[in-house]
Amino acid sequence: TGIKGSVLNPLGQMVAEQVRVRTPYPLPPDRLLGIFDDLAAKLPAADRVTVGMPGMIRHGRVVSTPHYVTKRGPHTRVDPKLIEQWRNFDAQQAVAERLEMPAIVLNDAEVAGAGAVTGFGFEVVFTLGTGLGCAIFDDGHLLPHLEVSRAPVRRGRIYDTYIGDAARKRLGHLA
């Protein structure tokens, strides 16, 4: 998995090469904020920041995040201390204060979807990455998040087991 950054113009076009770092684990909130500092230092100045992160995010606060609470990354042992650090963490305020600019923090699939939807009618966006992402829009308005990736499918397994990055690695790129 990776944490990426760039700068966009008002039309949503990249005006800087994307910078990327491999997601380090474990990843408490302060460590993620430090990564944002490092990414911002490598990019041109911006007026505001949008962060998309995995999990349930409500009004910029982390309800839950499936991967950042693990000791060694997705599908590894969960660290109860990290769960507590992330629970109800006001990521939006922390990012705004750290980078000294207005910030919005949403689920990563919602951020991707905002750049892809037409704004007409009911639109559902699915993203495939570390896990399955989902965003739902009605006439361009973002609807409350549905964390599909963690839903049980069968035999106690979740969707991420079957169609996330772990499945891609298991099956291969062309499966």
What are these regions (language model features)?
Residues 19, 24, 29-37, 41, ...:
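Glycine-rich phosphate-binding loop and adjoining helix at the ATP-binding site
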Residues 111-128:
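Short, electropositive alpha-helical surface patch
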Residues 59, 112-116, 133-136, 144-145:
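Short, well-ordered, mixed-charge alpha-helical segments that flank or form enzyme active sites
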Residues 86-109, 141-175:
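Glycine-rich phosphate-binding loop plus the immediately following alpha-helix
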Residues 1-34, 75-77, 141-169:
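Short glycine-rich, Thr/Ser-proximal phosphate-binding strand/loop in the N-terminal lobe
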Residues 3-8, 55, 132-138:
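Short beta-strand scaffold segments in enzyme catalytic cores
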Residues 48-50, 123-127, 133:
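Short glycine-aspartate micro-motif
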Residues 1, 53-54, 107-109, 128-130:
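Fold-independent oxyanion-binding glycine-rich loops
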